[in-house]
Design a protein with these regions (language model features):
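Beta1/beta-strand and adjacent pyrophosphate-binding region of the FAD-binding site
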Residues: 1-14, 32
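Conserved Rossmann-like nucleotide-cofactor binding loop
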Residues: 14, 39, 201
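Flavin-dependent oxidoreductases
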Residues: 17, 184-252
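Gly/Ala-rich phosphate-binding loop of Rossmann-like dinucleotide-binding domains
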Residues: 19, 23, 160
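Glycine-rich FAD pyrophosphate-binding loop
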Residues: 23-45
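Short loop/edge segments at beta-strand edges and connector loops
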Residues: 35, 88, 122-123, 170-172
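Dinucleotide-binding Rossmann-like beta1-alpha1 core, especially the glycine-rich loop
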Residues: 50-125, 129, 136
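Helical element adjacent to the flavin cofactor pocket in flavoenzyme catalytic cores
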Residues: 139-193, 197, 201
Length: 252
């Protein structure tokens, strides 16, 4: 049986980041991370758009706005430190019709309140950034938004975590718990603390520990359409004005 001070469940960006930070704060602690797949980042952390969002979608008094801004700054610095290719192409937010202009103004206000650099553009100015963009009268441009290959980030974090002394056990899935012991597909692990970073299954594990009784994770799958144009055909990311009631959902 394995014993540790802290067990982290889940080898995505969140789990790896937490494990590294715990190791930094408690250098003498034994930190173990388990990942059910054969490598870290095999799910959402390694299969996403790789956009480092600047943080102007969310209400400025929210933790999400704060952490998005700080996360963009810190992850940009991490990529530069690790020499991970970073495309600082920015992002255009475009309006479909007159009904989007009020929301566009609200996004600009949120950006200012949260200390995010944003530029208000006319449709003509937007076309200077991306000639093929279509917008109704106005657009917003976020120069701080960038894109990166998410798997390169995960791989770098995994290498750093292991070098810093975190024990990573791949092909090791969480099965259940018995008091202080966590059962996995290979062995039992006795841990002083358990950190639940299990992604889309985090709610199920949380319920076994007496949490998340009133919450459920509702997964959504994003679909990508590929064109036959060569990479780099567009100069920047182009996003529609989101539904500000829930910015995670983009309107077509």
């Amino acid at each position: 049986m394995t014993t540790c001070d802290v067990l982290v469940i889940g080898g995505g960006v969140i789990g790896l980041s937490i494990a590294r930070e715990l190791r930094r704060r408690r250098p003498n602690a034994r930190i173990v991370l388990i990942e059910k797949e054969s490598s870290c980042g095999a799910h959402a952390s390694g299969r996403n758009s790789g956009v480092l969002h600047a943080g102007f979608y969310y209400s400025p008094d929210s933790l999400k706005a704060k952490f998005t801004r700080l996360g963009c700054e810190q992850l940009t610095a991490y990529c530069e430190q690790k020499q991970i290719p970073l495309n600082k192409c920015g992002k255009l937010v475009v309006a479909k019709d007159a009904g989007d202009l009020k929301s566009l103004d609200e996004l600009f206000r949120r950006g200012q309140a949260n200390g995010i650099e944003l530029q208000e553009l006319t449709d003509i100015e937007a076309k200077k950034i991306e000639p093929r963009v279509k917008t109704y009268q106005r657009a917003l441009f976020s120069p701080r938004t960038a894109t990166v290959n998410p798997l390169l980030v995960v791989n770098a974090m995994q290498d750093d975590a292991q070098r810093e002394g975190v024990q990573i056990l791949v092909d090791t899935a969480y099965v259940g718990k018995n008091d202080r012991r966590v059962r996995t597909t290979h062995d039992s692990i006795e841990a002083g603390y358990v950190v639940n970073a299990a992604g889309l299954y985090a709610d199920k594990i949380a319920m076994e520990y007496g949490f998340s009784e009133k919450y459920r994770i509702l997964p959504f799958k994003g679909l990508y359409l590929y064109s036959n144009e060569p990479p780099g055909s567009f100069r920047t990311n182009i996003y529609p004005v989101p539904d500000l009631r829930n910015p995670a959902f983009l309107r077509a």
